[in-house]
Swiss-Prot record:
Belongs to the GTP-binding elongation factor family. EF-Tu/EF-1A subfamily. This is Elongation factor Tu. InterPro entries: Transl_elong_EF1A/Init_IF2_C, Transl_elong_EFTu/EF1A_C. Monomer. Keywords: Cytoplasm, Elongation factor, GTP-binding, Nucleotide-binding, Protein biosynthesis. One of its GO terms (molecular function) is GTP binding. The gene is tuf. Its main location: cytoplasm. It comes from the Bacteria.
Length: 31
């Protein structure tokens, strides 16, 4: 697996095996 870079307010989709297994929008980054 490769890390997914995300920014606040960025919509993202987590794909695995060509299918979307997770999707959403980053509301707050907890560092």
């Amino acid at each position: 697996d490769q890390p997914v870079a995300m920014e606040e307010g960025l919509k993202f989709a987590i794909r695995e095996g060509g299918r979307t297994v997770g999707a959403g929008q980053v509301v707050k980054i907890v560092k």
